[in-house]
């Protein structure tokens, strides 16, 4: 799909990968709707986009609040008349050992990382199918390819599997579905790590490329393809490495 003139909805757009993606799509000529809980941060991103000559709007959205998503979808479609590109980027990572994470935290992670994106996609997909035009991109994770963190990996495996299955089922519909699986990227989600990481612009560029040239899945940075391949052909080696 040509980005210029298209309408994109990006969730989790107040910072990190979502904010970088919104800026990149706007730079390429899309009309972008930024959705997240922190409206103040969203407005800062919109100000930066408009200052650079782009077009953007804000919707307050808590993706974990499933009951609110019909409102989010209808408001998003009303702003520019339709949604051509949906980037399911919102995600959280609450760290905790198995058996120790509170039930509310489990529900929050599952709803934000998995059930929310599925629900929002279900709400926006009919319009795309009717127009036979649309792009859906789900931001999963390398943790959705390599089982490591018990709940985070569980939600990202689920999102990745959902998107890949949806891609097959929508074949020849005019709607493409792709997965982006980032490794460690320098965002608020990885602030606990004290090592050099690529910036979110790397993933934003990958997402923009998928809009224009759809593919099944992109892993970025590229070197994470190596442990992913090992996980598939020699999982015992990955078991050994993760236990060290």
Predicted regions and their residues:
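Substrate-binding pocket helix/loop in short-chain dehydrogenase/reductase
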Residues: 97-110
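Active-site helix of classical SDR
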Residues: 121, 155-156
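Residue(s) in the substrate-gating loop at a strand-loop-helix junction
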Residues: 141
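C-terminal helical subdomain
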Residues: 179, 192-228, 232
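Conserved glycine-rich Rossmann-like NAD(P)H-binding loop of the short-chain dehydrogenase/reductase
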Residues: 28-45
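The beta1-alpha1 cofactor-binding region of Rossmann-like NAD(H)/NADP(H)-dependent oxidoreductases
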Residues: 61-71, 103
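Conserved glycine-rich cofactor-binding loop
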Residues: 7, 14-15
């Amino acid at each position: 799909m040509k980005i210029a003139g298209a309408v994109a909805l990006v969730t989790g757009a107040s910072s990190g990968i979502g904010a970088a993606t919104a800026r990149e799509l706007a730079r390429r000529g899309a009309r972008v709707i930024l959705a997240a809980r922190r409206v103040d941060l969203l407005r800062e991103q919109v100000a930066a986009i408009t200052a650079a000559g782009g077009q953007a709007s804000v919707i307050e959205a808590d993706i974990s609040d499933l009951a609110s998503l019909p409102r989010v979808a209808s408001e998003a479609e009303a702003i520019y008349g339709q949604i051509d590109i949906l980037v399911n980027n919102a995600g959280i990572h609450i760290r905790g050992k198995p058996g120790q994470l509170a039930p509310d935290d489990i529900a929050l992670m599952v709803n934000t990382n998995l059930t929310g994106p599925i629900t929002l996609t279900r709400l926006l997909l009919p319009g795309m199918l009717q127009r036979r035009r649309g792009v859906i991109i789900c931001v999963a994770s390398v943790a959705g390819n390599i089982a490591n963190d018990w709940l985070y990996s569980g939600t990202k495996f689920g999102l990745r599997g959902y998107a890949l299955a949806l891609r097959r089922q929508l074949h020849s519909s005019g709607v493409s579905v792709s997965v982006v699986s980032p490794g460690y990227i320098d965002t608020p989600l990885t602030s606990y790590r004290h090592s050099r990481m690529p910036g979110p612009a790397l993933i934003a560029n990958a997402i923009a490329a998928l809009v224009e040239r759809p593919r099944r899945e992109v892993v970025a940075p590229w070197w994470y393809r190596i442990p992913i391949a090992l996980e598939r052909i020699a999982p015992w080696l990955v078991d050994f490495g993760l236990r060290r």
